[in-house]
């Protein structure tokens, strides 16, 4: 069965893993998923990730992060979906929780957080919001 929204699947695996208090979760690998995980790691929402071989396919093992027993990610949501894409210019990028969270944006310069995109003055597709 084909997956219609691989990024939505990744975010759901992270959300479910943290709700179940898992140390790590597995996800199929792709370049977009790895770039999104790079942003989450840079911003301190996950401890890290590594590529693994999963029965002949490459996968990603995502090390989840907790702070005083609570998940580092309180909320994660997909913004731009396969049926409705959402684009934003650098000056119009949404702020999550008044700047306490991040928006993940796919730009011509790669997948960036909203702060990085504003700093580089680039807009793009708003992929997800995290806090």
Curated annotation (Swiss-Prot):
Protein's UniProt keywords contain DNA repair: no
UniProt KW Ribonucleoprotein keyword? yes
Pfam families according to UniProt: Ribosomal_S8
Gene Ontology MF terms in the entry: rRNA binding; structural constituent of ribosome
Q: Which domain of life is it from?
A: Bacteria
Cite the entry's keywords alphabetically.
Answer: Ribonucleoprotein, Ribosomal protein, RNA-binding, rRNA-binding
> InterPro entries recorded for this chain?
Ribosomal_uS8, Ribosomal_uS8_CS, Ribosomal_uS8_sf
GO annotation, cellular component aspect = ribonucleoprotein complex; ribosome
Q: Which GO terms describe its biological process?
A: translation
UniProt function note? One of the primary rRNA binding proteins, it binds directly to 16S rRNA central domain where it helps coordinate assembly of the platform of the 30S subunit.
NCBIfam families documented for this protein: PRK00136.1
Its family remark reads: Belongs to the universal ribosomal protein uS8 family.
Instruction: Kindly state the subunit structure of this protein.
Output: Part of the 30S ribosomal subunit. Contacts proteins S5 and S12.
Descriptive protein name? Small ribosomal subunit protein uS8
> What is the originating organism of this protein?
Rhizorhabdus wittichii (strain DSM 6014 / CCUG 31198 / JCM 15750 / NBRC 105917 / EY 4224 / RW1) (Sphingomonas wittichii)
Source organism phylogeny = Bacteria, Pseudomonadati, Pseudomonadota, Alphaproteobacteria, Sphingomonadales
